Amino acid sequence: MKAPVRVAVTGAAGQIGYALLFRIASGEMLGKDQPVILQLLELPVDKAQAALKGVMMELEDCAFPLLAGMVGTDDAEVAFKDADIALLVGARPRGPGMERKDLLLENAKIFTAQGAALNKVASRDVKVLVVGNPANTNAYIAMKSAPDLKPENFTAMLRLDHNRALSQLSTKLGKPVGGMEKLVVWGNHSPTMYPDYRFATADGASIADAINDQEWNANTFIPTVGKRGAAIIEARGSSSAASAANAAIDHVRDWVLGSNGKWVTMGVPSDGSYGIPEGVIFGFAVTTENGKYTLVKDLPIDDFSQKYIDKTLAELEEERAGVAHLLG
């Protein structure tokens, strides 16, 4: 048996956490031969800690052969101790009448503290995925608060947007998602992100040629993917938890086990490619191998695409400016 991998999960008793933990413990994220130790963080309030205890009881009752151990805590330094993978799911949700900038600042406090805790106690090769929104900026804050860890260890989740875009294209074309490749979602995990199928193929044939409808792209496809989260809240009465958990598993699985040459979308610190300032955490197409991701470089950007990329970058720059004073 392999040595267990330590997986830290914040917001572990929340809706996404509940949809995530059982799949990690069953081996869906890291493979059916990889034992895991779950290190679970919840808020230091009685209700959250009691809920966490209940989730841990259920995990025990599944008798997962790969679950080598569990820790439940309200202390980030306990949760992140020697963590190989950290899924930062917990974030302050936007309350009624709350401005986006207030939400940014509330979350900045959380992710500054979590970045510092990771910096202090996590494995030096920890792979961090930020799921809690605003994910790109929260990942940026955590990265900046962990100066001893490599910036490339910090990523934000755009895989949900990527998967949503694949599904919309599948419906439009009547083709299965399994045969689709070379889709990319650029930018921020927000309604400004830009799902781009110019390079994408379905069973080897160009998707752009098959659709050949720029009006559908601009007026239906892009807004549908961008507003899908809001549509689910409207329909379900609460936010997309199972699909977010599924995307987190996809993101980490590909990062750790490799994407076999396929493009996947990850929010990663820019190296200056495509005119995105260095260090901004931005959605790019990447391929992954041996636990490392590589940006897909030199894709042509047409005027239509540039407009969307500029817009999502402007939003990220504005968010970054809004928290700059907290990062020294």
Swiss-Prot record:
NAD(+) binds at G11, A12, A13, G14, Q15, I16, G17, N107, Q114, V131, G132, N133. This is Malate dehydrogenase. Its EC number is 1.1.1.37. Catalyzes the reversible oxidation of malate to oxaloacetate. SUPFAM superfamilies: LDH C-terminal domain-like, NAD(P)-binding Rossmann-fold domains. InterPro entries: L-lactate/malate_DH, Lactate/malate_DH_C, Lactate/malate_DH_N, Lactate_DH/Glyco_Ohase_4_C, Malate_DH_type2, NAD(P)-bd_dom_sf. It comes from Stenotrophomonas maltophilia (strain K279a). Keywords: NAD, Oxidoreductase, Tricarboxylic acid cycle.
